[in-house]
A protein has these predicted regions:
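Conserved RNase H-like, two-metal-ion catalytic cores of nucleic-acid enzymes
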Residues: 1-68
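Acidic active-site catalytic centers that drive phospho-/nucleotidyl reactions
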Residues: 11-13, 82, 101, 157
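Residue-level signal for well-ordered alpha-helical scaffold segments within enzymatic catalytic domains
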Residues: 39, 84-88, 118-122, 163, ...
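Conserved DEDDh/DEDDy metal-dependent 3′-5′ exonuclease domain
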Residues: 47-118
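A contiguous binding-surface segment within folded domains or other stable secondary-structure elements
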Residues: 113-129
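Acidic, Mg2+-coordinating catalytic module of metal-dependent nucleases/exonucleases
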Residues: 124-186
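Acidic catalytic cores of enzymes that act on phosphate-bearing nucleotides/polynucleotides
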Residues: 181-208
Length: 208
């Protein structure tokens, strides 16, 4: 891992429910707001600085530069949902960039998908601040108060995602209630992959 690493943790909300479109393509749902937490961490994964940013639909193209400069993009169910929902707005899929999906690893270990709220509740002792269905209701209402609630809801989900990621990275485990309402603990590995630098003939010569 580099001495300093840029990470972007993100989440988004959509304008429609799946039952409002003709298939299950997230790209047709429309994105209402995207919130992200951009930070710099040192080689020991300690945060040096960070900031929360939110973007409404008309400004989503501005996020590409932020994502493109990240050493790791972090989300929850982001590869199978958020990335697809963003396809109409960004020049390339985020999956083509260094992308870590927490749920992907949880499912690989657990064999089943687990909700963000369940992991946050048992791992962090925190919960979502609102019913997820209200996010679309707030967008439809579109008044100042509703949009403020929508933005805060999305940002708080980013905070949960960030804190779950940090807990898993540090403790190498996550805790949640499974399908049968049993509390389970699973081992996880959120560490960065080892980077093996290719040694050229010139580099090799300098070793002797």
């Amino acid at each position: 891992m580099k001495n300093k690493t840029t990470e972007v943790i993100f989440d988004l909300e959509t304008q429609k429910f799946f039952d409002e479109i003709d298939d299950f393509d997230p790209a047709k749902l429309g994105v209402s707001v995207l919130s992200l937490y951009r930070r710099t961490v040192d080689k020991n994964n300690n945060e040096i600085e960070g900031e929360m940013l939110s973007f409404w639909e008309e400004d989503l193209k501005k996020t590409w530069e932020i994502f493109n400069k990240a050493d790791r993009i972090i989300g929850f169910n982001s590869k199978r949902f958020d990335v697809l929902a963003l396809k109409p707005y960004l020049p390339l899929e985020l999956n083509k960039l260094p992308h870590f999906d927490i749920l992907e690893q949880v499912k690989d270990v657990n064999g089943r998908r687990v909700s963000l709220d369940s992991i946050a509740g048992e791992t962090l002792g925190k919960r979502k601040i609102d019913d997820p269905r209200n996010a679309i209701t707030y967008w439809v209402k579109h008044d100042k108060v509703s949009l403020s609630k929508l933005k805060r809801y999305c940002e708080e989900d980013v905070v949960l995602t960030r804190d779950i990621y940090d807990f898993g990275l540090k403790n190498k485990k996550l805790i949640f209630k499974d399908y049968w309402n049993t509390v389970r603990t699973i081992e996880v590995d959120f560490s960065y992959p080892e980077i093996t630098e290719k040694i050229t003939d010139e580099d090799q010569g300098s070793l002797f």
